[in-house]
Amino acid sequence: MTTIRGGSRRASLPALALLGVLLGACHSDDNAQVNTLPGFVSGNVRKTAYDGASDDLLTAGLGKTGLGSDTRPGFANPAQPTAAELRRLAIYSNYRALVDITPNGGYGRFWGPNVDLAGNDTLGEGKIAGTEYLAYSDDGSGRKNVTLLVQVPASFDPANPCIVTATSSGSRGVYGAIAAAGEWGLKRGCAVAYNDKGGGNGAHEIGTGVVTLIDGTLASASSAGSASLFTASESSSALAAFNSAFPNRYAYKHAHSQQNPEQDWGRVTLQAVEFAYWALNEQFGPAIDGARHGVRYRPGDITTIAASVSNGGAAALAAAEQDTRGWITAVVVGEPQINVRMTPGVTVEQGGVPAPSFGRPLADYATLANLLQPCAAAAVAAVGAPYLSALPVGLTQSIRVQRCATLAAAGLVSGADTASQANDALAQLHAAGYLADSDLLQAPMWDSQAIPAIAVTYANAYTRSRVTDNLCNFSFATTNSVTGAVAPPATSPMTSLFGAGNGVPPTNGINLVFNGASGGVDHRLATPDASFAGAFCLRQLWTANQLGIGANVDAVRVAANLQRKPAIIVQGRSDALVPVNHASRAYVAQNSATEGRASQLSFYEVTNGQHFDAFLSVPGFDTRFVPVHYYDEQALNLMWNHLKSGAPLPPSQVIRTVPRGGVPGAAPALSTANLPPIVQSPGSNAITVNAGVIDVPL
């Protein structure tokens, strides 16, 4: 690894001279003759070369076989893993978190390191040699510390340069989108510009004061200083008092940084692209005075596709909207969690009928779902839903009955019995914009804790709450595996957090707990109705506009103005985490009102597609749902052909897939019969978009 000294915060010119690495000691405009590090880069740039055999950019040396193995890579010393070991685990964990990793589900046949861009099994283990550049972006405070990472494959062609962004989905660390966008970019020979959006998988163990650094290794908060990925902002005395009252708790960057990082997702994605330009100029620019490099590539010189999924997809859209220097050429995103600033007259329709609700922000629909889903899961239409919980079935059923009863007692659902109360809860979700296509996913979205985790994390972020606030009596803690009560861990989860965590508890042994009269307990077990009081409190934050939540949500809304850039959005119709009415459909409708006929946006809605392809091996998911990732990759290929050969982008359309069927847990192998192509002439499947109105065929 080579260290390239950068920002003034941690480097001095004498030290640079001593080390003989004066490659970026000063910051200046990128139009200067000398290639200079962007001013937002803070501290050192770490440059590491990978040979494509023992280690590599895509699989961390694991290859297709290792990524597909259920045995995760270990540490030589479990108490003190190396940065390389943590990187390997992070790539393994994040790759598997975003795609179906089973052979029957398509891994190794439709996608995977061995599958080339034409869909053929020609790449063996799929290891990719190249170079990584790693650094922080910061505003000088030492508190932003957005992780930036650029991967430059050995196959990069300096004469035909390209960049693909891979902003992390969810609140994942910097490798979070390696399967969603990074893999395609590397196979295409493009540099890949990653960033963690300033909320990625940074934690602070309050009891010990341990924090993570940029490479996942650990340090005390006091010794790490501004090199910490995240340190809770409270004073040491305040944290000590909190730890005394609430031991074994953790602060998380997305939830507790008090910075509402989502408002900067577009900006930091643009910074990732600019950092990639610097890295490419550093690697391929002309040599100057034997030590420095000149500028070979200036803004707009490199074909750049802003890509990713979920939160990373939203970041790509926001970046394209904010781009004033020509960094981004085109956009391809999947299932974007995007909050749209809707204007009067914009409408979402399906089959010519206006949707009952559309364009709501996540703070609204997630807190509503968190309140109602445990009850709606008992509705008639949800019978037979996939079971996605480690809790005994009987306990889960009891939670559903009790949540319905409490909702009814509070006047929030109607009905004299559980069945009617559950049906009413589901009807309320329909009225709030959730499609009937996602009825069977209401239960697993809550049972898996995806919705509770999001509701709590984003409520904290949107209210700029501190860890010591215990917002709505929720906090993050280690717990007893049997009782769910807060308990000290046998081994600190911090050791492997960078490699195995996802940034939104429950994750890596850190759970979501409700702090009741008897102390903190797993939120599902704290009360018979699964912490209804906390869920209701979260909902009230939005409905009563408490603690500044409205203003902070407004700060993350986008205008849907892509500045005439060619763009593709892909989303599954059955998405129950990010409902399509509030995300993609709303964005496309608003874009048509904003850009009109100048818009170059196409939208592909995938029937039987839902948010988490990693769930597709779960019994009941395998028989009913198809991989949206397959269409994300097809969309990237379509965009590439459009940019490089002028091929027209297929118009907006519904893609009518065919579920695999069979027996839950033993569905037949995925085949092309399940995955019809995106076509140039969709006929009756065409989605019409005009003057702010989108109409999606039934």
From Swiss-Prot:
- What Enzyme Commission number does this protein have? 3.1.1.22
Q: Which residues form the active site?
A: S310 (charge relay system)
Instruction: Give the matching Pfam families.
Output: 3HBOH
Extract one GO molecular function annotation from the record: hydroxybutyrate-dimer hydrolase activity
GO annotation (BP), single = butyrate metabolic process
| Record's catalysed reaction(s) | (3R)-hydroxybutanoate dimer + H2O = 2 (R)-3-hydroxybutanoate + H(+)
Q: What is its main location?
A: secreted
Signal peptide residues on this chain, from the entry's feature table: 1-32
Q: What class of enzyme is it?
A: hydrolase
Could you list this entry's UniProt keywords, alphabetically sorted.
Hydrolase, Secreted, Signal
GO CC, sorted alphabetically, is: extracellular space
Q: Where in the cell is it found?
A: Secreted
Which pathway does this chain act in? Lipid metabolism; butanoate metabolism
Similarity-based family: Belongs to the D-(-)-3-hydroxybutyrate oligomer hydrolase family.
Query: What is the documented function of this protein?
Result: Participates in the degradation of poly-3-hydroxybutyrate (PHB). It works downstream of poly(3-hydroxybutyrate) depolymerase, hydrolyzing D(-)-3-hydroxybutyrate oligomers of various length (3HB-oligomers) into 3HB-monomers.
Which HAMAP family does its entry note?
Answer: 3HBOH
The protein, known as: D-(-)-3-hydroxybutyrate oligomer hydrolase
- The organism of origin for this protein: Burkholderia thailandensis (strain ATCC 700388 / DSM 13276 / CCUG 48851 / CIP 106301 / E264)
